[in-house]
């Protein structure tokens, strides 16, 4: 819908969830971002930017200068296009960070990178491959979370578990705003809290909501990641033929060897923790 429905004062998208005018951001121009931040600086006001281009989302239409770099390296033209789209997106992110640096805004600006789902490009079509987007596997669930704040966050690569539900408490803490006790997630800038986390949880829903007033009606799978173990529990109402799946993500990060039948006690223990988190 219209960007104003989300509480934004400025924006491009007015109808389609896949862009309409918003499709131009990143692909054709970054000027609306520059204009917005320049206006905020002129008015001496803090600003919030949600930069969410359809990059590397389809349509995969990268410029030839980027596609040429991958045409002979990728296993297919579809994959080459996707790789080029990723670099195109990287370029625009770099331009955004450079804008902040050039105006001495970086030290007072928290930048958070997140994605809504993973994507494994199907070599034989323009679509995503199985076991990626909309699946219960890491190809669809595992995405990068990056934080940039030169004045407060030193560059590092954390081996600990993080979740998208951590973004809200992280931003609230950074802004000095009290975090409601009912809000799930932890502050990712708190190294002690991150290191002490035991597990993360999640659910995979149908693409379209089955009942907007009852989220449980759309659940396909629930999952828990504890250390190197990942358990996936199907919703029998949605996936009647599916079985529980247990994987050792250190030894089998592509989730091809289901250990559930061999480790029933682990399945029971992890299922209890998953049920304690949420039982639809």
Identify the function of each model-found stretch.
Residues 1-32, 129-132:
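Catalytic-site neighborhoods of secreted/periplasmic enzymes
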Residues 19-21, 78-84, 132-136, 152-162, ...:
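Active-site rim elements
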Residues 33-82, 117-130, 265:
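Active-site His/acidic residue clusters
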Residues 48-51, 56, 145-146, 171, ...:
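A short aromatic-rich beta-strand->coil structural motif
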Residues 119-125, 131, 153, 165-168, ...:
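C-terminal cap/loop subdomain of S1 sulfatases and analogous C-terminal strand-loop tails that border
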């Amino acid at each position: 819908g219209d960007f104003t429905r989300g509480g934004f004062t400025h924006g491009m998208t007015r109808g389609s969830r896949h862009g309409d005018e918003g499709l131009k951001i990143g692909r054709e121009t970054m000027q609306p971002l520059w204009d917005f931040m320049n206006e905020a600086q002129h008015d001496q006001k803090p600003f919030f930017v949600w930069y969410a281009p359809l990059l590397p989302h389809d349509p995969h239409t990268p410029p030839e200068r980027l596609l040429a770099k991958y045409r002979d390296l990728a296993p297919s033209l579809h994959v080459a296009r996707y790789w080029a789209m990723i670099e195109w997106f990287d370029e625009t992110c770099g331009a955004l960070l450079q804008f902040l640096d050039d105006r001495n805004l970086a030290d007072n600006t928290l930048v958070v990178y997140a994605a809504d789902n993973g994507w494994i490009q199907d070599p034989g079509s323009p679509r995503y491959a199985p076991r990626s987007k909309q699946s219960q596997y890491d190809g669809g669930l595992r995405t990068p979370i990056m934080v940039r704040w030169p004045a407060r966050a030193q560059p590092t690569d954390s081996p600990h578990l993080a979740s998208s539900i951590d973004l809200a408490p992280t931003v609230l803490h950074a802004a000095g705003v009290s975090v409601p006790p009912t809000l799930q997630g932890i502050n990712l800038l708190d190294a002690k809290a991150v290191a002490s986390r035991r597990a993360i949880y999640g659910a995979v829903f149908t693409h379209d909501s089955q009942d907007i007033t009852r989220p449980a009606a759309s659940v396909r799978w629930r999952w828990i990641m504890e250390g190197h173990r990942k358990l996936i529990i199907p919703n029998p109402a949605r996936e009647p033929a599916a079985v529980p799946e247990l994987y050792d993500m250190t030894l089998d990060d592509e989730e091809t060897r289901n250990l559930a039948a061999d480790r029933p006690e682990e399945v029971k223990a992890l299922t209890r923790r998953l049920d304690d988190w949420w039982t639809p």
